[in-house]
Amino acid sequence: MINAERSYWERALYEQEYDLIVVGAGLTGQSVAHFFKKDHPDSRVLIIERGSFPIGASTRNAGFACIGTIGEHLADLEIESEEKVKTRIKERFQGLQLLRSVIGDENMDYIHSGAHEIFTDKKEFEQAAKSIDRFNGWMKDLIGEPVMYSETVYNGHPAIKQTQEGMLHPGKMIHRLIRLNMELGIEYRWNTAVTELNEEHSSVGTATGMKLKAENLVLATNAFTRSLLPGIEIQPGRGFVFVTKPIKNLTWKGTFHFHKGYVYFRNIGNDR
């Protein structure tokens, strides 16, 4: 590694103070930077990412755009208040509308496919089906959709169809957001691992010894947060995404949910 002393010009360019530094270039971090810059056009905003591209969950998921199934809502109501569950549903819906307006459906291959919640247990299906009218009433009040859920059958399985769901390409979504942010004048530092966070002096230190200061710091590193803030009790949960080999005459098309939303699957193209 070359440890050459920086020139006057380099120091003027790279060692100045920012109005906002965001650590983590996933969807959350880039969105924070995006809206901060739009609200403060003259501000200097920097996003720091340890990889050559975002390496967290933002681009390592199944590409669902959903606000929840009846099975999921019922499971949530067993451990949370009705008010909290309703708030989350409304915020999910509003967040998806905002995402689509910022990114553009065509820029992330968004398909408004609707969805099906699949059941293999008769009692679970009957319990969920009894709640259709209840949750349709919720959706009318929360998102203006009076008939979101309906009873049906899919590929021989009892199911509940829902209208407000879609699928998208997470990689294209993030790529588009990067382009938009660069057009706004937001700076990026790729392959830059932040190893130190100084809240008192509002600065971060990198693995290469660089110190960067900002009036505002945002840590948007999700599962990696404990490496910078070991005192915070964050335990990441591991999820798995499996991509099948090509399947001839694939009949499962759309987005599907199973087991109270803990298992979900979708098609990719016509044969996966």
Enumerate the language-model features and the residues they cover.
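Glycine-rich active-site loop/strand segments that organize a redox cofactor
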Residues: 56-91
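Flavin (FAD/FMN) cofactor-binding and adjacent substrate-gating region
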Residues: 71-77, 101-179, 184
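Glycine-rich Rossmann-fold phosphate-binding loop(s) that bind the pyrophosphate
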Residues: 24-30, 50
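Extreme N-terminal leader/targeting segments of oxidoreductases
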Residues: 1-20, 38-39, 43-44
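Glycine-rich, N-terminal phosphate-binding loop of Rossmann-like dinucleotide-binding domains
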Residues: 25, 69, 221-222
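Helical element adjacent to the flavin cofactor pocket in flavoenzyme catalytic cores
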Residues: 159-216, 220
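Active-site substrate-recognition segment that forms the wall
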Residues: 40, 50, 63, 106-111, ...
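Glycine-rich FAD pyrophosphate-binding loop
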Residues: 37-60
